[in-house]
């Protein structure tokens, strides 16, 4: 018999791989490590509400802006263009332009579906109910994607961002320790970063301080807070352009060495920006971010190049966070923090301690039972269990997976699954031995008889783990991940690894006089 065989080589390789990649996580040395989840590491947990009505309003605002710009280009005379949650409305001044207007609306419709109502020269346009529902769903997905993008740029490891309910999002941020980190993360997440260029209503702005929102609305304008000068400023309600045309944002320093955010527009945005500034020299244009006016300079000349700056007495950190928010894209809808909960690191440590005690305690009891009941066969099974644990930790570390409390429960469960596989193998071997067969044949038949049952049960469990991971959320994913890895590891260690050890020991086993020492079988071989 050959001492070394393919199965034993695989087992030794699995052992070396498991130990090698587990050391950084277990001993806190350099190398790939397992990331601890919120429940083990501590951090910030938030429940956010997405105001999808605002997404619909913003959609209609963008549509109204595009309609106004393109109608002017095509010399279609429109009056009183207004936008609200119910859609947009306007008046066509020249009935002869009706066909051109219909063609323009069809062009602006794109892949969406409009409901267009016409009463004489008055038009109203809105999305169909199906399109509105689709917009709300897509808004949730867009907000989730943007939050993940921002948190990645912020430098947080393994944030968990998932939809919860119809219009709510759960955000888990492991590792948030200080109040400053909490504040920055919260501000970065909740910032809509909705950038707009809007014209100042020069005719009525002098009365802005004494004006109500309703009075402004009747004028086709909107009252916003002026962050630069204080008070209020009256702007034309239909924006010139918005942040959808923004391509880049970065922190630069002005002539006073103060941090400001420089932004760049795409080709379409640059053209609209240039056309408007060229046609409105001497008038003011406001840079609006999240419904707050940061500056409203007088246009001195046509502004080409499609770039601008946002200043507002920012700190370097604030300017950096704003640039991240702008680069990652504007949220179609504002979000509101509905619930905030801090998980302290002490709670995480308690969870780790309790879980480790449960895991180690259960592991020792299992190994004790296996060694007492199955003798040396039980010891070999225990070796497989140890390698199984190392493999789980190693694979999670290699892929940078997050370990959660349910994940640790999954590890405990896989220990039971691995034990079950070894028990089936040992019982099949003992059955053949009791029938009077030799050790070599008993081991061979034992593995053949046990393998089918082990594969069937493990593959079924693996399919369940994959489905749980694919369709589950948060804690369920953590449980499914460790269970799935553990199942694959148990197949390698129980079927391949232990059989390799037996094959290496066959010369000794063939000569043994006591089956009890090796397999716990009390009767002796004939």
UniProtKB/Swiss-Prot annotation:
Presence of the UniProt keyword Ribosomal protein in the record: no
Membrane topology: Multi-pass membrane protein
Top-level taxonomic group: Bacteria
SUPFAM superfamilies, A to Z: Multidrug efflux transporter AcrB transmembrane domain (SSF82866)
Gene Ontology molecular function: protein-transporting ATPase activity
InterPro entries tied to this protein: Acrflvin-R, SecD, SecD/SecF_arch_bac, SecD_1st, SecD_SecF_C, SecD_SecF_C_bact, SecDF_P1_head
Cellular compartment(s): Cell inner membrane
UniProt keyword Lipoprotein, yes or no: no
Gene Ontology CC: one annotated term: plasma membrane
Biological process terms in GO annotation: intracellular protein transmembrane transport; protein targeting; protein transport by the Sec complex
Residue stretches spanning the membrane: 8-28, 356-376, 379-399, 405-425, 453-473, 478-498
Pfam families tied to this protein: SecD_1st (PF21760), SecD_SecF_C (PF02355), SecDF_P1_head (PF22599)
Keywords: Cell inner membrane, Cell membrane, Membrane, Protein transport, Translocation, Transmembrane, Transmembrane helix, Transport
Family recorded in the similarity comment: Belongs to the SecD/SecF family. SecD subfamily.
NCBIfam families per the UniProt record, alphabetical: 2A0604s01, secD
Assembly mode: Forms a complex with SecF. Part of the essential Sec protein translocation apparatus which comprises SecA, SecYEG and auxiliary proteins SecDF-YajC and YidC.
Function: Part of the Sec protein translocase complex. Interacts with the SecYEG preprotein conducting channel. SecDF uses the proton motive force (PMF) to complete protein translocation after the ATP-dependent function of SecA.
Name the UniProt record assigns to this protein: Protein translocase subunit SecD
UniProt organism field: Helicobacter pylori (strain J99 / ATCC 700824) (Campylobacter pylori J99)
